[in-house]
């Protein structure tokens, strides 16, 4: 994919919607907590399943939980404890944008992720 040059919002949106998955992964970043920032020397990281996050914006502000799933196609994540109740009473996970959460605990089982964050 060619680097974005246009300032037009419609072309910015189109580029995001048409982006391949390996580019969409870059849109899944979230801020690290102050403790993690000091420990790893970086301000943000990509959210993966198993990370513990705190919701910073929206109706569920202050809620903390583990990431259940990550959807690159939708650009959203689902978190334990962030649920909406449908009219028929069933509970469904509420998708969140990763930019609205802060990572408080990293899942470090993946060796490649550990090495990329510890750079």
Curated annotation (Swiss-Prot):
The keyword RNA-binding is annotated on this UniProt entry: yes
Keyword annotations from UniProtKB, A to Z: Ribonucleoprotein, Ribosomal protein, RNA-binding, rRNA-binding
Keyword Ribosomal protein: yes
Cellular component GO terms, alphabetical: cytosolic large ribosomal subunit
Gene Ontology MF term list: RNA binding; rRNA binding; structural constituent of ribosome
GO biological process: cytoplasmic translation; ribosomal large subunit biogenesis
Protein origin, superkingdom: Archaea
Coiled coil: none
Gene3D superfamilies listed in its UniProt record: 2.30.30.30
UniProt-listed SUPFAM superfamilies: Translation proteins SH3-like domain
Function as written in the Swiss-Prot or TrEMBL entry: One of two assembly initiator proteins, it binds directly to the 5'-end of the 23S rRNA, where it nucleates assembly of the 50S subunit.
Stated family: Belongs to the universal ribosomal protein uL24 family.
Record text on subunit structure and interactions: Part of the 50S ribosomal subunit.
Protein name: Large ribosomal subunit protein uL24
């Amino acid at each position: 994919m060619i680097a974005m040059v246009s300032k037009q919002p419609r072309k910015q949106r189109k580029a995001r919607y048409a982006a391949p998955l390996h580019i969409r992964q870059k849109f899944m970043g979230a801020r690290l907590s102050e403790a993690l920032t000091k420990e790893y020397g970086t301000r943000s990281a990509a959210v993966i399943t198993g990370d513990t996050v705190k919701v910073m914006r929206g109706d569920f502000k202050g809620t903390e939980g583990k990431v259940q799933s990550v959807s690159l196609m939708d650009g959203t994540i689902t978190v334990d404890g962030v649920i909406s109740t449908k009219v028929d009473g069933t509970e469904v996970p509420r998708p969140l944008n990763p930019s609205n959460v802060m990572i408080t605990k990293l899942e470090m089982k993946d060796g490649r992720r550990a090495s990329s964050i510890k750079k």
